[in-house]
Amino acid sequence: MALVEQLLGLGHRVATSGKDCQALDTLAAQHGSRLLRLPWQLHDEDQAASACLELCHAWGALDSLIINAGATDYLPDAVSATDVFETIVSSNQLAAEHCLGQAVPLLLKGEKPQVMAIFNRYSALQLYAPTRVTAGWNNTPQWFREARQSLKNQGIDLTVVAPHSLKTPVTSAMAFPEDWTPQSAAQELLQRLPLREPELVLEVTNLSSLWPLSR
């Protein structure tokens, strides 16, 4: 929500997928047609396609795609406590794959297109056998990294924002957890967005401050 609010404040047109809430209603009233609200169930392929179709009809092109790959909105009400983390990973993996697949044609029509995928400690976990080699099929950040060259060949830059990983480190520098708020994290990410860095390390002291558990 903070990313949407700050992008609108900077004068951008923003399309967002999120559950109906008072905060989005307020932003829509303030910014009118500059805010396009899309279906939120992006882990469902049909809903992701519907969102992309709405975006295509409204704008016809997309300059930047920012994927919140740590969302908890996709958790079903009946999910058991033991399955929460695996469901966060698998549902965000589906949403990310659907979003990127649907959005590429629109990005190709955009100006200097780029993608930023943002992960937290939970959604960056490796599925199935954690001792196995990290690969795109069991780790969503790695799935994006494996897609980087293909995107680059099409003129699309990719930034992966994720916690530091001991198995697949992207930097030798230590990143210490910080007390990020939604506003400060959004401001930092938007400042880094134009730099088009391949990797950014985001360590958060309190995950629920940025990704509250939606249950």
Regions found by a protein language model. Give the residues of each.
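Catalytic loop of short-chain dehydrogenase/reductase
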Residues: 108, 113-153, 165
